[in-house]
Structure formats: C-alpha cells, structure tokens
C-alpha cells in the first residue's frame, strides 16, 4: 500500500476501534430487539405502565426507542449469538452479566422497561432499565464500557440540544420526567446530576452559553 502511495487509516485496524464498532453494533441490535418485544403480549405490564400510567403516546415511545426486556434469562444472549457475535463481545457491550455462581452468562436486564441511551450522533451507547416488579435497584444502568461513561453522558441531549442552546436548560429528575416533558412540548429539558453544568457546556460546544433553570 505504501509503494502504491495509499495511506491506510490506522484507526480502521486499531483493536480498540474495532471493539467499539462491535459494541455499537450490538447496542443497535439490542435496541431494536427490545423495541420489538415491547409489542409482544408478554409485555402487557410494560405497555400498561407506559401508556396508562405515564400517558405516553406511540409516537413518543417510538421516538425514544423505548423497549422491554422479558423475564427470560438469556433470550437476548442467544439472539446475539445467532447474529454472529461471540460471548466476549456481548459481555464487553454490557448487555449480559455473569451468573452468581460464575457458571455462565445471563441477560443483564430482565422484566424491565428499557431506555436506550442515545448519543449526539444518534447511536445507542448503553441502556437504563426500570424494574416492573419491585426488583432492586429500581433503575439499572449499563456498566462502563469503551463507549459509555456515565459521568459524561446526558440523557435526551440528542433531542433537546438545540432548544437548550436557545432557551436554557430545565432540569428534571429522571428519564420518565424528561420524556413526559418532551411529549408535552417542553423540549429544553435535561436530567439533573451534580456534575451536570460543565458537562452541558462541553456537549454543546465551545462558545455556547445558556441559562440554567432548576425544577
């Protein structure tokens, strides 16, 4: 390649870049998988919670790519294996976890509503999952991965960034609060974290400014 004057991009052959690519792929497939399962009769409790208790429309559920992880232990794991991914790749994506007796792997999220964590490029970097049966913790997050770092991620900013730049940021407590506010037409919302202020500035880009409104 060098003799032919062709410069190869090293990042395409970098092991870390290739691992990140696999994680993005697995997350994308997982997002679609859980979205589809939300339409299944076994997801009736999740459907009832979202539509009746939280009053979310089909459009909102679809826009935020909300899904459902069933009670089964390894449905997603087996699905991803059939898609051609190996156990280590799936584990590094954070969507499976080791069994307590260390004798294998199970899906990380079970009987939970799934909220994909979307970055500013529109890619899923991780997941937050809400318990439907009282299992603790109430909200379970993806572990830290090569593409997900919880202290630098802002949920919903992919949709609210433009409005925050012009209207200021309105803080809310969690995913459901943000989604409900967004559906109601309040589109400059972001989830409140202690570290949030400087992270918003970084995410919006250098030179951006905005007012902060606390709710």
Where is each model-derived feature located?
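Conserved active-site segments centered on acidic
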Residues: 1-45
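Short, surface-exposed acidic
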Residues: 5-13, 54-66, 85-92
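Phosphate-handling DNA/RNA-contact segment within nucleic-acid enzymes
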Residues: 15-22, 26-29, 72-188
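Membrane-proximal amphipathic helices and linker segments at transmembrane-helix boundaries
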Residues: 41, 53-61, 67-77
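Structured alpha-helical
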Residues: 50
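Flexible loop residues that form catalytic
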Residues: 69, 130, 194
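Short alpha-helical
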Residues: 71, 176, 195-199
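Conserved N-terminal catalytic core of the sugar/cofactor nucleotidyltransferase
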Residues: 187-215
